[in-house]
């Protein structure tokens, strides 16, 4: 590519000539040797290591092949030309081959870097599409074919006689056609160079935006952790409240049994016989045998659910005393309800500070639309309960429910999992509607807040199950309720996004794209360094080469650039072919391991 080699007389000092010959004779052969050795390592590493066989690395192999050909077919002629005192003695054919190889391989290096830049742009800008369609060997082969086809097309005119050698001066082999030099420099270097700079600018801007989005997601994650803590805290308080009500109710029932001199016996239900028999035996140890009296049941408590049946046997003369005990029991339960309802409302008020918009999406955080409304509902229910009177109790056999061991687990699980809500003032009662109405069933009703439970939140969509259906289903569990609310939460959040109606990629594809994106980020940094080094090495030569061609077009007998600057810039460009393998070794761990395995004949890999 030297376009001014006839200016060899620029070096006039004999001392400078000697120093130049010594330096050129020692150091110039090292450049093609390093280029051949390093690029062969790159090619072998990609074909030996399966983990390196990616689209990007296939393009890197194409770049290594072009650098290898520069070292073999261009630098070797350059060393010979310099050692022969810049006199070409191989004839016009080899001169044209030398020039064509120089132009073709240099153009291929530039276009390979452009293809790599396009590959980086697709991988960073559209990671899911790249993981689906871009990471295929066929696309890499198409890119490589286009690169080498254009490079050969650019260099082909040199073989067709565009730059003929003068018959009277066969000792010089130079690119003397200024028009070809200018056009080839613009289309082979400057246009691809500008395109690569634009692409890498967009790539790094995308990476910066992605980093900012990652920081925002981390901030939102901390806020979500607070919300999760509030949810867990509210669920824990609800479980503690239910457990306390259950234990306290059982304790009060036992106290009533002792106060009325009654003792529990087995009911008609055979399922509970094995459960309550130890309790009966314990009472029989303390109480003497008596003649059975007509019995009646204790009215159901509105603040707790029904439980497996136990029968309370009592004397007729204890009816009045029993009614007084029942009133004390109701007052005690109301006091406990007041205490723990205030506590749970305070906890819900704290959790609301993290986002009141979750009321509709997650109704299990707070059952009402506001804390104030919950308190109003609490006072209204309490006043309604206080005005309820006991029905006339007749001395006949009735039952009251106490949880069995088997049902207690189901009751605890369902009561912890099901949401309680109140919306638009509509109430749906799932417990005993009246203290005088008697229940003889298994424990399917639950402890609840303020005696009411709303199922409207589960009936918003026609395809959802109602709360009654869920209660009737014995297999209803915590995972069922969480699945309902996760689906509702996802739909509510997806409507807020712009592309909620687009088909979502599979989870496997997202994980693959995420992993691919991390790897592409590292590869992008490495290839950005390769591009920077390439520009540093080749930009001086092409600037001087274009300037010299413009000067020759203006005046055929004068050149703007001297021989020595152009000669040094040419070898600086050749040096780039030796630096690329060093860049891969420094910045890419996989290439470094592959180089070490090749140089050690696989010893490190076997270990």
From Swiss-Prot:
Disruption phenotype: Does not result in the 'fainting' phenotype where worms arrest locomotion and acquire a straightened posture. Suppresses slow locomotion in grk-2 background animals. Does not affect the body bend swimming frequency of animals. Restores early-stage body bend swimming frequency in grk-2 background animals. Significantly reduces learned bacterial aversion induced by mitochondrial insults. Rescues learned avoidance behavior in cat-2 background animals. Residues 1-23, 80-96, 163-182, 545-558 are extracellular. Expressed in the neurons of the head, ventral cord and tail with weak expression observed in body wall muscles and PVD neurons. In the ventral cord, expressed strongly in GABAergic neurons with weaker expression in cholinergic motor neurons. Expressed in cholinergic SIA neurons and octopaminergic RIC neurons. In males, expressed in the dorsal and ventral spicule protractor and retractor muscles, and the sensory post-cloacal sensilla B (PCB) neuron. Expressed in the head acetylcholine neurons. Expressed in the AVA, AVB, AVD and AVE command interneurons. Expressed in premotor interneurons. Residues 402-435 are annotated as: Disordered. Its main location: membrane. One of its GO terms (molecular function) is G protein-coupled receptor activity. Disulfide bonds join 95-173. Residues 413-424 have a biased composition (Polar residues). GO terms for cellular component: plasma membrane; postsynaptic membrane; synaptic vesicle membrane. It is found in: Cell membrane. The chain crosses the membrane at residues 24-44, 59-79, 97-117, 142-162, 183-203, 524-544, 559-579. InterPro entries: GPCR_Rhodpsn, GPCR_Rhodpsn_7TM. It is a multi-pass membrane protein. CDD domains: 7tmA_D2-like_dopamine_R. The keyword Membrane applies. GO terms for biological process: adenylate cyclase-inhibiting dopamine receptor signaling pathway; G protein-coupled dopamine receptor signaling pathway; G protein-coupled receptor signaling pathway; locomotory behavior; positive regulation of male mating behavior; positive regulation of transcription by RNA polymerase II; regulation of locomotion; response to food. Residues 45-58, 118-141, 204-523, 580-607 are cytoplasmic. PANTHER family: ADRENERGIC RECEPTOR-RELATED G-PROTEIN COUPLED RECEPTOR, DOPAMINE D2-LIKE RECEPTOR. G-protein coupled receptor which binds to the neurotransmitter dopamine with high affinity leading to the activation of an associated G-protein and downstream signaling pathways. Couples to G-proteins to inhibit adenylate cyclase (AC) activity and cAMP production. Antagonizes the D1-like dopamine receptor dop-1 to negatively regulate the rate of locomotion. Negatively regulates locomotion through the activation of goa-1 subunit proteins which inactivates the unc-77/nca-1 and nca-2 ion-channels in the command interneurons. Belongs to the G-protein coupled receptor 1 family. This is Dopamine receptor 3.
């Amino acid at each position: 590519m030297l376009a001014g080699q006839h200016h060899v007389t620029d070096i006039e000092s004999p001392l400078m000539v000697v120093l130049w010959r010594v330096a050129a004779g020692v150091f110039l052969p090292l450049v093609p040797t390093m280029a051949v050795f390093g690029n062969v390592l790159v090619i072998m590493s990609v074909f030996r290591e399966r983990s390196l066989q990616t689209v990007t690395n296939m393009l890197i192999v194409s770049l290594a092949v072009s650098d290898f050909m520069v070292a073999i077919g261009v630098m070797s002629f350059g060393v010979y030309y310099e050692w022969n005192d810049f006199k070409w003695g191989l004839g016009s054919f080899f001169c044209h081959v030398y020039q064509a190889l120089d132009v073709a391989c240099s153009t291929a290096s530039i276009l390979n870097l452009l293809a790599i830049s396009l590959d980086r742009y697709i991988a960073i800008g559209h990671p899911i599409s790249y993981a689906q369609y871009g990471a295929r060997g066929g696309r890499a082969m198409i890119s490589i074919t286009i690169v080498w086809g254009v490079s050969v097309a650019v260099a082909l005119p040199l073989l067709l006689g565009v730059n003929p050698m003068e018959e009277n001066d066969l000792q010089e082999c130079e690119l003397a056609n200024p028009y070809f030099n200018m056009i080839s420099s613009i289309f082979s270097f400057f246009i691809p160079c500008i395109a690569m700079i634009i692409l890498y600018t967009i790539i790094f801007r995308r990476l910066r935006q992605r980093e900012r989005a990652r920081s925002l997601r981390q901030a939102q994650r901390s806020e979500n952790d607070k919300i999760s803590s509030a949810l867990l805290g509210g669920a824990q308080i609800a479980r503690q409240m239910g457990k306390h009500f259950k234990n306290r109710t059982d304790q009060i029932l036992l106290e009533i049994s002792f106060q009325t001199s009654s003792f529990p016996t087995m009911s008609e239900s055979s399922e509970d016989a094995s459960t309550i028999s130890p309790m009966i035996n314990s009472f029989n140890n303390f109480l003497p045998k008596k003649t059975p009296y007509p019995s009646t049941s204790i009215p159901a408590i509105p603040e707790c659910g029904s439980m497996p049946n136990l029968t309370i046997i009592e004397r007729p003369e204890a009816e009045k005393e029993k009614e007084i005990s029942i009133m004390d029991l109701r007052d005690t339960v109301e006091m406990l309800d007041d205490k723990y309802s205030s506590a749970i409302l305070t906890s819900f008020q704290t959790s609301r500070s993290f986002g009141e918009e979750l009321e509709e999406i997650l109704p299990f955080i707070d059952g009402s639309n506001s804390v104030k409304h919950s308190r109003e509902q609490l006072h209204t229910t309490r006043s309604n309960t206080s005005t309820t009177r006991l029905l006339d109790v007749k001395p006949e056999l009735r039952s009251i429910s106490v949880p069995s061991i088997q049902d207690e687990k189901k009751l605890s699980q369902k009561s912890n999992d099901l949401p309680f809500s109140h919306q638009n003032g509509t109430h749906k009662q799932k417990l005993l509607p009246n203290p005088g109405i008697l229940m003889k069933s298994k424990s399917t009703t639950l402890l609840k807040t303020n005696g009411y439970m709303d199922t409207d939140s589960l009936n918003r969509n026609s395809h959802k199950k109602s709360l009654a259906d869920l209660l009737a289903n014995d297999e209803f569990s915590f995972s069922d309720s969480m699945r309902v609310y996760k689906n509702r939460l996802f739909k509510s959040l997806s409507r807020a996004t712009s592309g909620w109606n687009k088909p979502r990629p599979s989870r496997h594809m997202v994980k693959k794209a995420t992993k691919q994106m991390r790897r592409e980020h590292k590869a992008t940094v490495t290839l950005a360094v390769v591009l920077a080094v390439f520009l540093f090495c080749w930009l001086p030569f092409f600037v001087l080469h274009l300037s010299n061609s413009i000067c020759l077009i203006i005046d055929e007998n004068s050149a703007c650039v001297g021989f020595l600057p152009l000669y040094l810039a040419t070898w600086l460009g050749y040096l780039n072919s030796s630096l690329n393998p060093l860049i891969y070794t420094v910045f890419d761990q996989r290439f470094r391991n592959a180089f070490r395995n090749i140089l050690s004949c696989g010893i490190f890999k076997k270990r």
